[in-house]
Amino acid sequence: MHAKINPKKVEMFNLLKEFLDGKDSVFFLDYRGLTVATLTELRNRVENEKGELKVVKNNIMKRVLKDKHMEGLDSYLLGPTAVVTAVDEANVIAKIFYEFVKTSSLKVKGGFVLGEVYDEAKLNAYSKLPTKKESISLFMNVLKAPISKLARTLKALSDVKDVKV
């Protein structure tokens, strides 16, 4: 005898599978105690950074993760769970979570970033990394510093020569 599968659950499975398609980072949050307004604000901030947030049923999400070969994440699927995905600059989205953690009851459970399982502590450290723009800016400043010093030295030499003449 075959157990009849609920079509709503199959549909939810397919939607969650699609939700994870093409995403290289997935985060798990405990939203217990958040007001609707706070959760909506979190969702909007995540979407502004090209991420997506969905409240999920843990058992269905476990099956989706297994189907996607994303192992080692079951421990993050306990209690109320919101799943956030990111395509680019996942640490920017992680920064958003930790801003909310400071002022609300939001808890970061863990995540899956570029094929690796991150616990809460590792995600917290990851959220403190500079963004792509900040990294490029830092790199440009490092490159620019010796050139600026050379330009100032040449200018000083030029000024000295002008004084002697």
UniProtKB/Swiss-Prot annotation:
It holds the Pfam family Ribosomal_L10. Forms part of the ribosomal stalk, playing a central role in the interaction of the ribosome with GTP-bound translation factors. It comes from Borrelia turicatae (strain 91E135). Transmembrane segments: none annotated. This is Large ribosomal subunit protein uL10. GO terms for molecular function: large ribosomal subunit rRNA binding. InterPro entries: Ribosomal_uL10, Ribosomal_uL10-like_sf, Ribosomal_uL10_bac, Ribosomal_uL10_bac_type. GO terms for biological process: translation. Belongs to the universal ribosomal protein uL10 family. Part of the ribosomal stalk of the 50S ribosomal subunit. The N-terminus interacts with L11 and the large rRNA to form the base of the stalk. The C-terminus forms an elongated spine to which L12 dimers bind in a sequential fashion forming a multimeric L10(L12)X complex. GO terms for cellular component: ribonucleoprotein complex; ribosome. Keywords: Ribonucleoprotein, Ribosomal protein, RNA-binding, rRNA-binding. It comes from the Bacteria. The keyword Secreted does not apply.
